[in-house]
C-alpha cells in the first residue's frame, strides 16, 4: 500500500518497512524523525497498536519492536512485517467510498467525518489504540468519568473537498473497487493532509456513536439498508461491465 502511495505521489507519512529482527533503531529514527509509530503492516481492529507504539527514542523503539515480534495472545503480529512511520499530530478524518477506480463518474465519495479524541489525551495518544477502542484497559486507562474515547463530527466544509480528493486518489492508486474507508490525518504544523491507510472492505455498522460508518450515514441522512443496497448494486453494475 505504502509503495503504491509513493508511486502515485499520494501524501503519506514517511515510512520504513521492518521485516525481521535485524533492524537498526537509531537509523530508523534518523530517517523518520520523532515521534514515530510502529504498527503491523497488516492488521484489523487496531490489533497490535497501543500508545506505547508511539516512540521518541531508540530505547523505546527497540522495546516496542521486540514486543511486537513476540506476538500478542498467540497472534502473530508480524506475518507481513512491521511499518514504522512518522507520527502525524493533528486532526484525523475518515472517508467512505463506494464504487470503482476506473468508473469515477459512478462512484460515491461520502462526506468525511472527523474522529475527535477526548481532550484529556496527550497529542501522541490521540489515535485508535487497541486497549481503549475495545475497552480492555490492560495497559491504558479509560477516559475520565467514563466519557467517550472519541466522538465523530462532520468535517469542516473548508477542507472537505481536499480530504475527499486525497481519499479518492489513494483509492485509485490501489485500483480500488467495492467499498472502502480511507483514514487521513492533517498535520497541525504544516496543514498537509496525509493518507494513513485504505481499509478495503471495512467493517460496516449503523451504530452512529461508536463506528465511523454509522456516523457518516447519520450526517448524510442515509440508512444502513440504503448503504448495503448501494454496495450490492455497485457490485452488480461492475459485473455487467
Regions found by a protein language model. Name each.
Residues 1-90, 101-103:
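Active-site nucleotide/adenylate-binding loops and adjacent lid/helix of ATP-dependent enzymes
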Residues 4, 9-10, 104, 148, ...:
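ATP-dependent carboxylate activation and anion-phosphoryl transfer catalytic cores
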Residues 15, 95, 112, 182-184, ...:
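A structural signal for short, well-ordered beta-strand segments
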Residues 20, 100, 117, 189, ...:
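Short coil/turn motifs at secondary-structure junctions
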Residues 24-28, 92-96, 236-239:
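Short, solvent-exposed polar/charged micro-motifs at secondary-structure junctions
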Residues 42-43, 135, 201-203:
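Short connector loops/turns at beta-strand edges and beta->alpha or beta->beta junctions
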Residues 46, 138-152, 212:
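A short small-residue
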Residues 58-147, 158, 162-165, 193-194:
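Phosphate-binding site of ATP-dependent enzymes
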Amino acid at each position: 500500500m505504502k509503495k503504491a502511495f509513493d508511486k502515485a505521489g499520494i501524501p503519506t507519512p514517511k515510512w520504513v518497512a521492518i521485516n525481521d529482527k535485524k533492524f537498526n533503531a537509531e537509523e530508523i529514527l534518523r530517517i523518520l524523525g520523532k515521534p514515530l509509530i510502529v504498527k503491523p503492516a497488516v492488521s484489523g481492529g487496531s490489533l497490535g497498536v497501543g500508545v506505547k507504539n508511539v516512540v521518541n527514542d531508540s530505547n523505546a523503539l527497540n522495546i516496542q519492536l521486540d514486543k511486537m515480534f513476540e506476538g500478542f495472545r498467540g497472534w502473530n503480529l508480524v506475518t507481513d512485517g512491521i511499518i514504522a512511520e512518522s507520527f502525524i499530530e493533528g486532526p484525523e478524518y475518515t472517508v467512505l467510498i463506494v464504487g470503482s477506480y476506473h468508473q469515477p463518474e459512478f462512484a460515491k465519495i461520502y462526506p468525511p467525518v472527523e474522529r475527535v479524541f477526548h481532550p484529556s489525551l496527550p497529542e501522541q495518544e490521540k489515535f485508535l489504540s487497541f486497549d481503549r477502542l475495545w475497552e480492555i484497559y490492560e495497559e491504558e486507562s479509560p477516559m475520565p468519568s467514563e466519557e467517550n474515547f472519541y466522538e465523530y463530527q462532520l468535517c469542516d466544509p473548508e477542507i472537505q473537498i481536499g480530504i475527499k480528493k486525497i481519499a479518492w486518489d489513494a483509492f485509485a492508486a490501489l485500483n480500488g473497487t467495492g467499498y472502502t474507508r480511507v483514514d487521513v490525518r492533517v498535520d497541525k504544523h504544516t496543514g498537509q493532509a496525509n493518507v494513513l491507510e485504505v481499509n478495503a472492505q471495512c467493517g460496516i455498522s449503523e451504530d452512529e456513536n461508536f463506528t465511523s460508518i454509522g456516523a457518516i450515514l447519520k450526517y448524510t441522512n442515509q440508512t444502513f439498508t440504503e448503504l448495503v443496497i448501494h454496495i450490492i448494486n455497485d457490485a452488480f453494475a461492475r459485473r455487467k461491465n
